[in-house]
Amino acid sequence: MHCSSPKMVCETKIVADEHDAIHGTKKESILWSSPPSSAPLNPAEAKDVRKDVVFIREFERGDQEEVRRIFYEGIMERIPNTAFRGLWQQPKTQFLYALLTIMCFYMTKSVMLTCCAPLILMGARYYYSRKVIQNYLDCALHTDMADIDAYYMKPTGSCFWVAVLDGRVVGIVAAQGHEDENTVELRRMSVDSRYRGKGIAKALGRRVLEYAMRNNYAGVVLGTTAVKLAAHKLYESLGFRRTGQSEDYRLPGMSRSPLERLFFQIRHTRYRLQLREE
């Protein structure tokens, strides 16, 4: 039987312009022997803490608004990334769009319309990316992100943490236990865009791995639709290994209409970090 870990605060020192402040590289495959938990700081001690120190603590009800803001902004960033940058991951779609552009020329014999065709296609991609991702966001904000306490803090094997810098919540991450597979799923990781590049995401990821180790799970899994290479490098630096990939992933809220399939594609990648042999 797994049990939730006691409330604790993990202190991580973050230096302002240091891009890898948290120790751990690709060479460090498994290094998740957890340090002893430290007691929460009292107000007198908190005054002496430097402003470049990040604290990762468990979610509290008063964090709800900031947590939802960080999650919302992080998901909304994926609209242009999916619409435009994501196209480079879809060679078949590139070929199809090129074919449609050529067909436009042969059917209209208009150079102007042919030159406008790629712009129309990109506009349609942005429209459908926004539509699908907003539907997904609406679904999330009305399920687990609507009541974090009920979804993550109360169930056994799950937890939610926030990263706090200078009294402000700047990052979030969740762990959801799957008893049937003896794994923990890393979910909802996001860092405020103003505080990225300081090692906060890596510290949040390590917190989930420590939690899994303390509760005797065999592994940690995650699935991501992130387009940016930096996100995938982060997971690999934590020790995760890619286990699968889908080019035809269906997000919650998708209708799968012909136009949506034509103008919205997203790659879903699965990762796993094996903590111990079962």
Show which residues each predicted segment covers.
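Cytosolic, low-complexity regulatory segments enriched in Ser/Pro/Gly with interspersed Lys/Arg
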Residues: 1-53
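Acetyl-CoA-dependent GNAT
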Residues: 12, 75-80, 85-98, 102-187, ...
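Conserved catalytic-core motifs of GNAT/GCN5-like acyltransferases
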Residues: 9-10, 41, 128, 138-144, ...
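Hydrophobic alpha-helical core bundles mediating ligand binding, dimerization, or RNAP-core interactions
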Residues: 68-71, 75
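Hydrophobic adenine-recognition pocket in adenosine-nucleotide-binding enzymes
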Residues: 59, 189-191, 224
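A short beta-loop-alpha structural element at the N-terminal edge
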Residues: 55-66, 93-94
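Conserved GNAT acetyl-CoA-binding A-motif
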Residues: 212-224
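Conserved acetyl-CoA-binding loop-helix of GNAT-fold acetyltransferases
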Residues: 188-193, 197-214, 233-237
